[in-house]
Amino acid sequence: MVIEQSIYSSSQSTGTAQANLELPLSSPLHLSGRINTKALFSPDNQSQSGGFEFEIGVDEVGRGPLYGSVVVAAAILPKAWSGETEVGLLQDTPLAILTDSKKLTERKREKLFEPVKQHALAYLVVEVPAGVIDEINILQATILGMRVACEQLMVEITKVWRDASELPTAPSTPLGFKLLIDGNKVPDLDEARLATHGICLADMTVTQPAGMVKFCAEAWVKGDARHNAIAAASVLAKVYRDRQLIADGARYPGYGLEGHKGYPTKAHVEAIARLGVLPEHRRSFKPVQQAIEGTLAGTHYS
């Protein structure tokens, strides 16, 4: 099952990033991903209790650049492969070299990209463009991307789970999710929207309707180096964005986007001063603001 979607409103899929956010968004979020329905609900991925509890690793890339989107990815690995990195569950698998994408060379990340997509039970990549970053700020844009990734992947999997015609197991088999978020904070999800799809936060203090799909969420500091599912998401996000910047480097010669990937290097800032601001530059970031105001000359950032 392939996922391809564009979202023009932050409430269309996730609820507002913050209470005073104006809707709709001026630029669309783009979602792309895949669910391997046969593998996802195979007996190999059932828990000892007979149900399914999927660990969804979530990571982002691109908060610091002056140019382009921030990209968030979410990934579910097979149960036998999903766990803390130090346990060594990926040894002798096609993902044996998987770790935090920042510790991998570009060549190794590229080598892992297709195998991660091929062997993941499900994955989703969310692209939050520069226009949205300028509209709601980079922090809220990152949170929004994480919300979309978490919610939409849970919703799509729950839809498949409820469709008995696509499953090798009965749809009454319990289903749950554990969200593993790279960083020190779990984004607030739109629980009202999730409830309309029969998904709720696991809470032992509240009586919940029977048959609800439950989820919990954890923040993992440096999680991309600590958990295989987060590391897989990290590689997907990094390679997706890098490929985008390499393509844009060919579209916009002279800016060096294919090299610095949009980050505020001296060469990038000098190129902006010399060649001008591109549509995908983040106008809310200081060096870009200075270029627009004509005050960038002689100033560089590293």
Swiss-Prot record:
One of its GO terms (biological process) is mismatch repair. Its cofactor is Mn(2+); Mg(2+). Residues 53-297 form the RNase H type-2 domain. A divalent metal cation binds at D59, E60, D163. It is found in: Cytoplasm. Gene3D superfamilies: Ribonuclease H-like superfamily/Ribonuclease H (3.30.420.10). It holds the Pfam family RNase_HII. CDD domains: RNase_HII_bacteria_HII_like (cd07182). It is an enzyme of class 3 (hydrolase). The keyword Nucleotide-binding does not apply. One of its GO terms (cellular component) is ribonuclease H2 complex. Keywords: Cytoplasm, Endonuclease, Hydrolase, Manganese, Metal-binding, Nuclease. GO terms for molecular function: manganese ion binding; RNA binding; RNA-DNA hybrid ribonuclease activity. It catalyses: Endonucleolytic cleavage to 5'-phosphomonoester. InterPro entries: RNase_HII, RNase_HII/HIII, RNase_HII/HIII_dom, RNaseH-like_sf, RNaseH_sf. Manganese or magnesium. Binds 1 divalent metal ion per monomer in the absence of substrate. May bind a second metal ion after substrate binding. Its EC number is 3.1.26.4. Belongs to the RNase HII family. PANTHER family: RIBONUCLEASE H2 SUBUNIT A, RIBONUCLEASE HII. Endonuclease that specifically degrades the RNA of RNA-DNA hybrids. This is Ribonuclease HII. It comes from Psychrobacter sp. (strain PRwf-1).
